[in-house]
């Protein structure tokens, strides 16, 4: 549906226009919206108009069947014990989910297993960090485990804090504090402060970027090892008690997590191919993405003991200071009387090939059974997984139950819906990636969309959505139909509360929708296969709350009680997320015409091109000297805009009783995302193949637009060979221009 995101006359708008549309244009757009809506309504065929009410009634029945109390019960059941990937406990949970999905009424529910490389602490030789004196005596050791939360003291098989896939090693040396270990932090240390990190052990605080990027940056700097810790400035919200009296991180709490740099490869031993019984496996020395230096996480109580002795240079500015009572000196090494002391790492973790299990449920479509809409989320957790992932798994469970109830009553979706409970997401998205690799040919031909369902909440302030532009209109229209769960918005729509609390910085009158990055199971579907993807959850107020994510992330304190006592006592936010995720899946599976709007892609493509052009114009002399031009990209985007507009007009006029024409145009919409995929992938990241979107090279969690061009421009003023660097910029512009032109071609009327 035409909405304020679209522009009324794409051919007459200057490419480098101001961000905000003028008031007159908004009035004109609104007028055209009304006229278009009325025109479209009155030209509906009698059959189509007659079908609206039954379809709407089924959707209402589906949404009404979703119950907060059921989600609460499912979450409680899923969080009684740990479900670490590769363990018997997680296998048993897979079988439990399989059995219950069958009871709910799905046509089939199967287990799909793979043998992948996982990582575990050594049970007899624990990992820890020590301070040693000049004779090698240990004078301080970090904690070996987290104090258990109340009520969980007798739970066994709680994995102690560790960095998954850290190599074994016992390096010792001077300590250097590197802030968040971002690229810009190392630029500050090495270029401005002239501090050499080579041969040092680094300590960095969690936050801002993916932990694997921190480790990669440390390796590039020549470090012997890196220690990660959660600073209270990032994981302790002001005015809130630490767990169990509040939702803040205690001093002994530690964030677990993998530290791989896979760039979409999946299992490190079988990159690009499923890790089945007959797969060829690389040797460990050849494995993809494994870190080369020891890594270990600690809590901020232990970090205090290390940082309080730091000598050397003072922090360059206040942005390097956390909230511990330490000076945050950079080092290298300790100060004064402690200068002869060193830091030593003791890392003994083991990498092992272990079997993992996905649960795949199928609800067969009645009209287009060969077109798949997928709802997937992972079930493996570092410990109890109260938020990550079981708040998402509980919602998926309830969505499956609601769909199953409709099926038992004789209803079927138009298209097939697949439900997935992924394994080993925490280790590197292994379950989803291996399954997608095994089924890639089928998915490329039949995949309509993938909706991710990891954690349902990371706060309780407002909705957060990341998705392809094809789904913008779908998400906006759906949220206008749903009731907001937010206090002060009684009787108002979810769209209204979302728009007020998180407005788009680019489009007036619309809520913010973010780009897809990575760090979750949509990666292989979107970045490698080009299947339209999205995700939704409830989040915190990112404007006022500067702490990273939620404080107890990946710690032993991420329990059911954390959610039930502090985040969502009535589970109304979980229910809202279930309605959004389930509603999106319902529309994707049942709309006669795919609910994708290609015009939204046209608008964002132009914005992305403008952004990169503006970045490049920070170097006007080099642009001129090396004959770098964005004209081909702007021309391609302009062409895409015109063709997308024409396509949308044809959709409005489409005879929906003509099955051949309907199939043709639906397939054009389905394959549009695929048209942005290039077979060779991005430079040095072959499994990231989407030309428009990719995870940032400097932070896996964040999405970047036109990533090939962006990476070529990054830090270009410091490249050794400017001619080669600007040549790469030109090459990436040409690839982007070709891809956008080619994608536009797929929307042309079929001869």
Swiss-Prot record:
InterPro entries assigned: PA_dom_sf (IPR046450), PA_domain (IPR003137), Peptidase_M28 (IPR007484), Peptidase_M28B (IPR039373), TFR-like_dimer_dom (IPR007365), TFR-like_dimer_dom_sf (IPR036757)
Region (NAALADase): 275-588
Keyword Repressor included in the entry's annotation: no
Gene Ontology cellular component annotations, sorted alphabetically: plasma membrane
Tissue specificity of this protein: High expression in the duodenum and in the jejunum brush-border membrane. Weak expression in kidney.
Co-factor binding details: Binds 2 Zn(2+) ions per subunit. Required for NAALADase activity.
UniProt binding sites for Ca(2+): 270, 273, 434, 437
One Pfam match: Peptidase_M28
Glycosylation sites: 51, 77, 122, 141, 154, 196, 337, 460, 477, 614, 639, 646
Keyword flag Thylakoid: no
Residues holding substrate: 211, 258, 425, 518-520, 535-537, 553-554, 700-701
Activity across pH: Optimum pH is 6.0.
GO BP, sorted A to Z: proteolysis
Function: Has both folate hydrolase and N-acetylated-alpha-linked-acidic dipeptidase (NAALADase) activity. Has a preference for tri-alpha-glutamate peptides. In the intestine, required for the uptake of folate. In the brain, modulates excitatory neurotransmission through the hydrolysis of the neuropeptide, N-aceylaspartylglutamate (NAAG), thereby releasing glutamate. Also exhibits a dipeptidyl-peptidase IV type activity. In vitro, cleaves Gly-Pro-AMC.
Name of this chain's protein: Glutamate carboxypeptidase 2
The species this protein was found in: Sus scrofa
Lineage: Eukaryota, Metazoa, Chordata, Craniata, Vertebrata
